[in-house]
Swiss-Prot record:
This is Ubiquitin carboxyl-terminal hydrolase 46. PROSITE patterns: USP_1 (PS00972), USP_2 (PS00973), USP_3 (PS50235). GO terms for molecular function: cysteine-type deubiquitinase activity; metal ion binding. The active site is at C44, H313. Interacts with WDR48. Interacts with WDR20. Interacts with DMWD. Component of the USP46/WDR20/WDR48 deubiquitinating complex. It catalyses: Thiol-dependent hydrolysis of ester, thioester, amide, peptide and isopeptide bonds formed by the C-terminal Gly of ubiquitin (a 76-residue protein attached to proteins as an intracellular targeting signal).
Length: 366
């Protein structure tokens, strides 16, 4: 498979029938649909993330279950549920759908996306997951208040004001532990921090396992960076490290490929070759980690094509029922598993145009 320079002029109907032929009538999964999404002017950042999330099965199932509930006031989640439902209930197995309602709502809700410029797929993913979680938490809060009002218990003290966990958290949320050890008294203090995705630095000719190991490297705090130890009641040299305490059901890994270059006064792309395996086991876990021995399978990759954050293009590769598909806006193609290697990045020239993995989605086997 090569870079698809002529993808935009492909006939949609021909593309759809070719995909059915490539998969084969006998192999085509029952109740599965492969639909491209129309680009409404540089909305590939959005289309690529939506396709990746659609093929994260737990996420898709919860969005469709939300659609099945009683009619709610329109918000970003209802628009997403309508889009997913539209794909899942199509009579045809393959085709193209315009996510017009979702894009309109997105632009209405956030000024950052209310234009026709290229946006960052990771920023969009972050915004979408947090917005959905906020909507679900607000709905739960309203349900509780309505229940109290109905039962005449409005004066009951609130159990706690901490927002309830939603299915977004159940799927994507993990926990990091920031451990700091004072080198004078050996006291270890730790602070937990939740995440919906992990952002990791990239280096040339490495792997995701290496990037994650670097993420947890021990850092020495000395000189002006000394740590205030509450046991010693003074600033002391210390060692600091980050550990994974709780692993999520779906691990979303963001590769930090855009770096600000002082001499250029702008961000440039690090097209480094970073190998991401089809199977991943995490080793950088804390001593009190929950489910520390967990195996993950790669289910989707959002790929950035181009040389910079504000130009270029996003596509997505997904695994569905044992085979791999490439989604490039309205184009959908079946690809060989070996073709995934083309999206690792380049072995030379950091700013050269490339198609490289940007957001990886790994799903736990348990």
């Amino acid at each position: 498979m090569t870079v698809r320079n002529i993808a935009s002029i492909c006939n949609m109907g021909t593309n759809a029938s070719a995909l059915e032929k490539d998969i084969g009538p006998e192999q085509f999964p029952i109740n599965e649909h492969y639909f491209g999404l129309v680009n409404f002017g540089n909305t590939c950042y959005c289309n690529s993330v939506l396709q990746a999330l659609y093929f994260c099965r737990p996420f898709r199932e919860n969005v469709l279950a939300y659609k099945a509930q009683q009619k709610k006031k329109e918000n970003l989640l209802t628009c997403l549920a309508d889009l997913f439902h539209s794909i899942a209930t199509q009579k045809k197995k393959v085709g193209v759908i315009p996510p017009k309602k979702f894009i309109s709502r997105l632009r209405k809700e956030n000024d950052l996306f209310d234009n026709y410029m290229q946006q960052d797929a990771h920023e969009f993913l972050n915004y979408l997951l947090n917005t959905i979680a906020d909507i679900l938490q607000e709905e739960k809060k309203q349900e509780k208040q309505n229940g109290k009002l109905k039962n005449g218990n409005m004066n009951e003290p609130a159990e706690n004001n901490k927002p309830e966990l939603t299915w977004v958290h159940e799927i994507f949320q993990g926990t990091l532990t920031n451990e700091t050890r004072c080198l004078n008294c050996e006291t270890v203090s730790s602070k937990d921090e939740d995440f919906l995705d992990l952002s990791v630095d990239v280096e040339q000719n490495t792997s995701i396992t290496h990037c994650l190991r670097d993420f947890s490297n021990t850092e020495t705090l000395c000189s002006e960076q000394k740590y205030y130890c509450e046991t010693c009641c003074s600033k002391q040299e210390a060692q600091k490290r980050m550990r994974v305490k709780k692993l999520p059901m779906i691990l979303a890994l963001h590769l930090k490929r855009f770096k600000y270059m002082e001499q250029l006064h702008r961000y440039t792309k690090l097209s480094y070759r970073v190998v991401f395996p089809l199977e991943l086991r995490l080793f950088n876990t804390s001593s009190d980690a929950v489910n520390l021995d967990r195996m993950y399978d790669l289910v989707a990759v959002v790929v950035h094509c181009g040389s910079g954050p504000n130009r270029g293009h996003y596509i997505t590769i997904v695994k569905s029922h044992g085979f791999w598909l490439l989604f490039d806006d309205d184009i959908v193609e079946k690809i060989d598993a070996q073709a995934i290697e083309e999206f690792y990045g380049l072995t030379s020239d950091i700013s050269k145009n490339s198609e490289s993995g940007y957001i990886l989605f790994y799903q736990s086997r348990e």
